[in-house]
């Protein structure tokens, strides 16, 4: 099957874009990911950086990646049940290892678990419309749960939102020293992530996967619609997303990121805007692909998309080395951390381009495929990596 280079490019953008937000999760305490005022006071530099990233990137690139993951489930259906279940089960195992031994911000475990449920929904959906509508419904259920959590939450500030000095020192200690203490804390993080997945986030993740599968089945993610359609759709959806999210950003700033309102209720506009902006971004890439495809950088980013799993893990390897093993954790603010993003992007791009000159797949993708073939009991092909 001939590869869809546009789809690879969009996936590459998603992987690179995720790092814009993850870099603060690597370089700062966990509370800083959503709360720029995690340490009490906040500088204008931090506030403006948070606002800009929240508007263009927070949740949007993860949503885009979930959309493409769902599209991949649709594309895998001809492989059959054993192949898909083996592939996703291996992803669950990889995510568990990644989250337990390397980094507490893993997304692979969640994607694998939700994928094991969603692929059957994709397979059994009688039409594109029913698949899309089910995805929208599941996503809205997740938003409803988020609203419920906000309504029942205590007005007392949580230590997870604004940790005290001892909590910050302890987090810094176990991240820099590693060992059994770090594994124990990451295990707690995996447990908390699974609880959040089952209670709230899993609904949204499943919804986006089904929407992505519907867009693939309809031909939309295959580029089968007109350039004019993609351009108009993209501009409209991005505008809608910005209009929904911008007032919430301003209100959080106005409220000084108070836990009572900002930890749950004012997260909702961002979560609601994310599908509009994520699909809008993809639509603009498809609409302007004839122009974009002329640039070598765009084709290089498509190589990153072909090796998405490898590059996601490479980001973890580089960033945990820098911030935990070399001791750069908590040495930079939110804006300064962005200076690390471009070198990591360059590493992703250069490694992908060079690797794919000699092999057909990324190293982790190749291993994943070989293990899937064995687990599914399928004859192993002799194709090159």
Regions found by a protein language model. Give the residues of each.
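Membrane-interface helix-loop-helix modules in multi-pass inner-membrane proteins
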Residues: 81-83, 90-121
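Solvent-exposed interhelical
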Residues: 80-82, 119-134, 214-236
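Membrane-proximal cytoplasmic C-terminal regulatory module of class A 7TM GPCRs
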Residues: 360-385
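Juxtamembrane membrane-water interface segments that cap and precede transmembrane helices
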Residues: 41-53, 178-193, 256-267
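Specific transmembrane alpha-helix
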Residues: 63-78, 109-122, 200-223, 273-293
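Alpha-helical transmembrane segments of multi-pass integral membrane proteins
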Residues: 205, 259-358
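N-terminal signal-anchor module of multipass membrane proteins
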Residues: 1-69, 76
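Long hydrophobic alpha-helical segments that form multi-pass transmembrane helix bundles
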Residues: 133-215
């Amino acid at each position: 099957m001939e590869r869809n280079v546009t789809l690879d490019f969009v996936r590459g953008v998603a992987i690179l874009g995720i790092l814009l937000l993850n870099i603060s999760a690597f370089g700062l305490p966990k509370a800083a990911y959503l709360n720029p005022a995690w340490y009490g006071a906040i500088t204008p530099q931090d506030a403006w950086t948070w606002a800009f990233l929240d508007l263009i990137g927070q949740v949007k690139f993860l949503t885009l990646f979930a959309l493409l993951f769902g599209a991949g489930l649709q594309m895998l259906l001809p492989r059959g049940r054993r192949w898909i279940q083996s592939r996703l089960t291996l992803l669950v195992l990889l995510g568990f290892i990644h989250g337990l031994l390397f980094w507490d911000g893993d997304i692979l475990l969640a994607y694998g678990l939700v994928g094991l449920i969603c692929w059957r929904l994709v397979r059994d959906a009688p039409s594109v419309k029913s698949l899309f509508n089910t995805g929208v419904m599941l996503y809205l259920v997740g938003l409803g749960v988020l609203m419920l959590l906000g309504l029942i939450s205590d007005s007392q500030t949580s230590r997870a939102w604004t940790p005290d000095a001892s909590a910050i020192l302890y987090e810094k200690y176990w991240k820099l020293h590693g060992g059994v203490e770090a594994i124990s804390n990451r295990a707690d993080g995996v447990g908390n992530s699974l609880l959040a997945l089952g209670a709230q986030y899993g609904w949204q993740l499943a919804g986006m996967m089904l929407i992505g599968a519907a867009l693939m089945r309809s031909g939309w993610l295959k580029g089968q619609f007109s350039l004019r359609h993609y351009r108009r759709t993209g501009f409209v959806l991005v505008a809608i997303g910005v209009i929904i999210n911008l007032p919430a950003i301003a209100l959080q700033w106005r409220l000084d990121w108070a836990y009572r309102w900002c930890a749950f209720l004012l997260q909702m506009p961002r979560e609601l805007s994310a599908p509009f902006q994520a699909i809008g971004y993809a639509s603009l890439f498809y609409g302007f692909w004839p122009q974009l495809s002329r640039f070598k950088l765009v084709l290089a980013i498509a190589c990153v998309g072909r090796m998405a799993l490898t590059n996601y893990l490479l980001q973890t390897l580089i960033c945990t080395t820098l911030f935990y093993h070399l001791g750069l954790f908590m040495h930079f603010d939110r804006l300064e951390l962005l200076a690390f993003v471009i070198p990591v992007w360059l590493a992703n791009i250069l490694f992908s381009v060079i690797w794919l000159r000699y092999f057909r797949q990324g190293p982790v993708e190749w291993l994943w495929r070989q293990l899937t073939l064995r687990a599914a009991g399928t004859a192993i092909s002799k194709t090159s990596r």
